[in-house]
Amino acid sequence: MLKQETKLLWHEWIKVTRDRCHLHFELEKNDLSFHIETCLKGSERTAQRISEDIKKEPKFILDIGSSVGFNCFSIAKKYKESKVFGIEPDEEACKVANSTAKDLGYKNIEFVNGLGETLPFSNNFFDLIISHTVIEHVKNVDKCIDEMARVLRPEGYIHIEAPNYIWPWEPHLSIFTTPLCSKPLMKFLAKLQKVGEEVSYIDHLQPVNPIWLERLFKKNNLKWDNRANTKYLLASVGETKDIAAYKNSSVFYKFFLFFKKIGIIKPLTKLALKLNFYPSILYTVKK
């Protein structure tokens, strides 16, 4: 599947990325093909959610924070007639992504080294912009949203998924926090929960939340649909497939099922949504 040159790029990237982020790719326990196959399955689920959400066929698509390209691969497979761009600040990741795309036979993908805060594209260029668990990692959230709005075409869409830091849980480090937790307090709580050297990872996190993002949407004259409302309301009446991801990783799912069992999940869900008190952000934004 992958040429030897691409495999070497992968292994070089894995060596340096351990010093840059929280991820440990389990490559010591599994081979590279296993890792790629597993990540592709996850990205295919993401692409499916986006295609269900965005009915319009996009011509030009941008994935912000594309890393080594998994979401772009699945999006390009879903939209075969589209041109897909991935932008990623990690130069080594871009090299891996471009080489992997070539080996896998993708003709409609291009990976660019750059930042979400200074997108190297003209105004009104993209029909669809994707920010999948990335906005909490950028240096300047406000500038990144401004740039998305600038390069998005009229009637174009932005798909945003991210943790909600009003919810008292930090998913990257798997620690309990407080609503709207400050970074110093988050570090303190991480140490109490015996997080080791990864505590420093908190320094580059941006504690995004619906209030912050909706203010930026309004500033840029964007319309938005808070898809989390639909997601959790449907779950409260029995459609739990969209929250099944929490099943093995969060007490949220256990509490959800308990409150559902005793018959108070509907009013609790409505109250939680009103207070923006839920685990993850999910927006469809339109220009």
Feature annotation, model-predicted:
Residues 159-187:
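Conserved class I S-adenosyl-L-methionine
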Residues 142-157:
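A short glycine-rich, Lys/Arg-flanked "PGG" loop and its adjoining helix->strand segment in the class I
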Residues 67:
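Conserved glycine-rich SAM-binding loop
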Residues 131-134:
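A short beta-strand submotif of the Rossmann-like class I SAM-dependent methyltransferase core
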Residues 70-78, 82-117:
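Class I SAM-dependent methyltransferase SAM/SAH-binding core
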Residues 39-57, 74:
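Conserved alpha-helix/loop element of class I SAM-dependent methyltransferases that forms part
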Residues 5-32, 193, 205, 211-215, ...:
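A C-terminal cap/extension of S-adenosyl-L-methionine-dependent methyltransferases
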Residues 117-128:
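A short acidic, Gly/Pro-enriched loop at the edge of an enzyme's catalytic core
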